[in-house]
Amino acid sequence: MSDSGLQTDVLVVGCGIAGASAALAAADSGKDVVVLTKAPSETSNTFYAQGGIATLGANDAPALFGEDIIKAGDGLNDPEAVRILVEDGPRLVQEILIDRLGVPFSRGADGGLNMAREAGHSRRRILHVMDTTGMSIEKAFLAAVRSHSRIRFLENWTAVDLLTVPHHSRDPIAYYREPRCLGAYALDNATCKVARVMARETILATGGCGAVYLNTSNPREAIGAGYAMAHRAGARIVNMEYIQFHPTVLYHREAGGFLISETVRGEGARLVSTDGRTFMDKYGGLRDLAPRDEVARAIFEEMILSDSPFVLLDLASYAKIDIPKRFPSIYRACLAVGLDITRQPIPVVPAAHYSCGGVLVDGRGRTSLAGLFAAGEVACTGLHGANRLASTSLLEGLVWGTRAGKEAVSWLEEGGVRPADVHDWHYPDKAEDVDPALINQDWLTIRSTMWNYAGIIRTRKRLERAKADLEYLRHRVEKFYQQAALDPKIVGLRHGIQVALMITHAALANPVSAGAHFRLD
């Protein structure tokens, strides 16, 4: 691609389940689509999803599913978003994942789909591919996206900023027009050159922001780029205080935030203290199957009471299943660090896992900025309220990704802005090489600050300290960014500090504890 860039009908930024669904939906309508990803698609949150994807099980109904979602979300869910998911989701699972992509979901001896149960669900309704569901879904989607004649796949590119009118327009008269997204400035990670990707409609599907925390189940690429770009472009962002912490991530220095799926507890595993006591009984009737926020706080409190950096998840003593067969990925990962989970309990800690807030969208994925759609974790549909029910993230990505792709095509305008109408990327006259020591230390500051001051349990004083420290750092990072020779690391750092502040500001502004946002004061 030349520095002048390219033009397309629809630009999709990201290629997890939401981005891939959107790309296929738009391309199936006969439109040209560019899919932009900053790293190999195997680093998406979809790829790492173990537990499964919710649908409707036996003796189940949309109303029951919806009740579980609303209960987990502390009643702050958008009822219309819940209705869309429980009515459209099961149909799209069948039509796209099973019939079209052939995802090999686990089946029972009778050949029927095997349904698991997870925390917060009143029925067994979780489809899974053993414990590698996300990997199987992502591989199937990638094969379909890469082979589609109307989709151009750009891997190893970093989205720097969204292109908008009037902000990036050469035409001064454009300031009288309604703000509109026109695509994105994109950095070729190999050459470190920036190109304009002009699009008549743009769909953000960049995933979440767990990697702004010290402990996370997300890949390190999950720094919230989409939130930051949408915020700078003027799109409305909501509910950023609702950061869900997964209760059980493997506690081991070599584990890299490996997630121990809630399905493990669904199959009977119990949380126990380091001296062998079960403790979830005192935190509510659902015990180990309580919603994630309750379990995460219970573990956090138990760690404080026992002065231990972890608790134990005992699968071997309580689950009546063939552990290596049911959880092959978890079994192998634990074995690799010296744990035989058929005999030993698993040391676990809570970790930042999912953002329930994001770029506000309607039922079709439209944001408040014309020309911009969003789907998946980067979007806030209102579905999750204050806390997400287990195994609904993949389903939400599938539903809103498909809807956003179709809706973007229906809004395509004739003509559009030409690349010549938009400013070229400005390179500093004397760009400085990026010092990795500065990048690493700035990230350590962000992640430690967020974990200690804006984590599982928050107070006004902690959040005010986080705000002050992060604001100071943001000014330094912005100066660093303006003077540096552009590369993916400095772009990512700029996105990350912006997102950390968005979370902190939202948490400070909301004194009411609900779901994943817990204020001790």
Residue ranges and their predicted role:
Residues 1-10, 28, 179, 189:
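Extreme N-terminal leader/targeting segments of oxidoreductases
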Residues 6-8, 25, 29-31, 40-43, ...:
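Glycine- and aromatic-enriched mobile tails/lids
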Residues 10-35:
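N-terminal Rossmann-like FAD-binding beta1-loop-alpha1 element of flavoenzymes
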Residues 39-70, 74, 244-247, 255-258:
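Conserved N-terminal glycine-rich FAD pyrophosphate-binding loop of Rossmann-like flavoproteins
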Residues 41, 229, 235-346, 407-416:
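An anion/pyrophosphate-binding glycine-rich loop and adjacent beta-alpha core
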Residues 79-90, 125-143, 154, 216-224, ...:
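Short beta-strand to alpha-helix junction loop
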Residues 97-193, 198, 205, 249-252:
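Conserved redox-cofactor binding core of oxidoreductases
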Residues 161-191, 339-383:
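FAD-site-proximal beta/loop scaffold in flavoenzymes
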